[in-house]
Amino acid sequence: MTANVAARERPRRRGPAVWGVIGLLAQVAFAAGWMIAETWQGPRYSPLTDTISDLQAATAPHAWFPIACFAAGGLGTFGFAVFGLRPAWRGAVRIAPWAIGLSGLALGNSFPQIPCQLSASGCTATGQLLSAGGLTDAILSGAALWLLAITPLQLARLLIPLPQWRALARPLRVAGVVALAGYGLLALALLTGVWAGLVERALVAVCQLWLAVLAVNLIRTSGAGDG
């Protein structure tokens, strides 16, 4: 009887770990999408000044690669947050898993495509923004990055009652402060046209880092009695 119960419980305990691994792989996939795709852009494209979104523009070389990576990263992040973190937090944190998951889907979406890269001759920021792809990307990425900037601060407070998660309160608080500062700097960089690509990449890296920390902790605490 005891052996049968243990056999039934084993898959349940593995479930959170599986979603934690998926969450980690999702961040790797998303990072690969922009870090690798940068290597084959033309000489006019610069990671310092051009955004990640331009890598998936209709005129970008091999745009299918970042599009596929971003889609995989977005879907993986959604599954990790909704099917991994939400059950692990057992109702103590209700909104944040959905905010994380939907942000992942928003950042993973590449359609409709941006019509051209700003580094290409004849492409302008106004032309990008007035297109369906450019406007969609601006709205979705802006909202998603904002959610990923403020969510760590909320989690830093809400996770304290959970013994297996309270140790992350301080790192999440730091990540939230840095991400919010990065979001403000990104808005300024986009307005002035100075180092927008660099600031965006730094902000995205911070967001991916704290998501990876959550994924590692989910794996580490899988099967723990207090989640």
Listing of model-derived features with the role each one plays in the protein:
Residues P11-T221:
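Hydrophobic, aromatic-enriched alpha-helical segments typical of multi-pass transmembrane helices
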Residues T2-R8, I219-G227:
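Short, charged juxtamembrane terminal tails flanking transmembrane helices
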